[in-house]
Amino acid sequence: MLWDLKLKVGHSSRTIADCLRLGREDITIRTALLEHRFLAGAADLAYTLATRLTSELFRKTGAEFIEAKLAERAARHQRQGGQRYVLEPNVKEGKGGLRDLQTLYWIAKYIHGVKSPADLVDRGLFTREEFDTFSAAEDFLWAVRCHLHLIAGRASDVLSFDMQVEVARRMGFE
């Protein structure tokens, strides 16, 4: 159904052994496994996967994960020009964009086992104000990105000059 709606859906079908093996070999796959979710089927199998990922893949590899994610971030920033303040930002991949927020959350989830960014407050990792700022930034960037996609009629992550006025208008800015 999701494909019929022309939605891009990340998915894979693997055994638990394959998940563990591939997760050890590839940090991108490991990150995807960190974000896995049960949709339908054998709930006991999903529980076994989650338990084994935590005990056999995530536990005791936090430093390795952080190092890899920070290296990915540095490479991504370099590809985007390395600038924080740009006139036509990439809202997904640029400095301060959605991927930076996701990276921060993925690291917290990996290290502390949180289920949502709100859990960071309960764990004392974010103050309520920091969480509110994080959430507002994430909501804003997602809204900008969704408007870019709707206006362009395709995936588009660069807030170019020709898109800025229309995105601002749609978001209620004068």
Regions found by a protein language model. Give the residues of each.
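A nucleotide- and high-energy phosphate-metabolite-utilizing enzyme signature
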Residues: 1-174
